[in-house]
Amino acid sequence: MKQIINPLKGNNDKVPIWFMRQAGRYLPEYKKVRETTKNFLDFCYDVSKATEVTLQPIKRYGFDAAIIFSDILVLPHALGWEVDFKENIGPILKQFKSQEDFKYLQINPNYKLEKVYEIIKKVKKELPSPISLIGFAGSPWTVMSYMLEGKGKQDFKTSKKFIYENKILAEELLNFITEKTADHLINQAKSGADVLKLFDSWSGVLAEEEFTKFVIEPTKKIILKVKEVFPKTPIIAFPKGAGLLYEKFIKEVPIDVLAVDQMVPLEKMKEWSDKVIVQGNLDPVVLLTNKEIIKEKTYKILQAMKGKNFIFNLGHGILPETPTENVEFLTEYVRLYEEKNSNSTF
């Protein structure tokens, strides 16, 4: 049985471990491959290179899951939207402003997404059988906000002003992205992904009414559509920064796994783990410190979630400046805890 899926089968005696952005800039072997391709999106579509970097952290650390190397913005890019990645700046997109802009979006995605599915098939062939393969997409609100802002990591005034003032158009764009996201996830499962994940990086900027409309409702639609085709494929949802709205999300969205950020109290994680599998939530900055601090913070999480439906991960992605030896230490510590979790002196 695949380790990452163990909690889904009621087997919670072992703690599965993997990390968001586990294939990335903190790895010297990743940097070496990344330097061979100037354009980031071209790198994401390169079957050989994306396969190689997907497998790198598995070879180095033996995580319980590999997550396909891709990006949440490959979907709008494959649908014809202008997306570019500028070094030291991040994604730059054509800004969606009016009904006229729908003419730049294609009903059917172009060949680029086929490259993503090829990567999944290739990784699946090379991945050791006990290890799960995770496919993913950006959740509609996060992808939509990139399109409305024209760039990432803003204060989201533009996006929020747009959805307040243009309710019908905003809903039309949301529905379009929701439908295409579900299709993208279904195709990833068809290609061999064992688990699927939805990243809603910017869900935390919305008030409750908008959170319901732009996060809860589309996520629910996507999951129901995927489950019609793949009822047994586990789905992880990560409405990052949702705060108190995590509880509303759990109540209204039929997810298998809830990924949570580092701001969520351990008591809440324990409580929620009776309803769903909880994934998280070590602060990524802890991995920039030292072994004693890593051990202290990790132990608290493992003790709190002992015997619970739980997958160990970070509260967000591994930071580029993270020392590889700290990732190794953390992984080994979690493994050692598994072996000795009945020993009260551990």
Swiss-Prot record:
The record marks D71 as: Transition state stabilizer. One of its GO terms (cellular component) is cytosol. GO terms for molecular function: uroporphyrinogen decarboxylase activity. Substrate binds at R21, Q22, A23, G24, R25, D71, Y146, S201, H316. It catalyses: uroporphyrinogen III + 4 H(+) = coproporphyrinogen III + 4 CO2. PROSITE patterns: UROD_1, UROD_2. Its EC number is 4.1.1.37. It holds the Pfam family URO-D. Gene3D superfamilies: 3.20.20.210. It is found in: Cytoplasm. Keywords: Cytoplasm, Decarboxylase, Lyase, Porphyrin biosynthesis. One of its GO terms (biological process) is protoporphyrinogen IX biosynthetic process. Signal peptide: none annotated. It is an enzyme of class 4 (lyase). Pathway: Porphyrin-containing compound metabolism; protoporphyrin-IX biosynthesis; coproporphyrinogen-III from 5-aminolevulinate: step 4/4. Belongs to the uroporphyrinogen decarboxylase family. Catalyzes the decarboxylation of four acetate groups of uroporphyrinogen-III to yield coproporphyrinogen-III. Homodimer. This is Uroporphyrinogen decarboxylase. It comes from Rickettsia rickettsii (strain Sheila Smith).
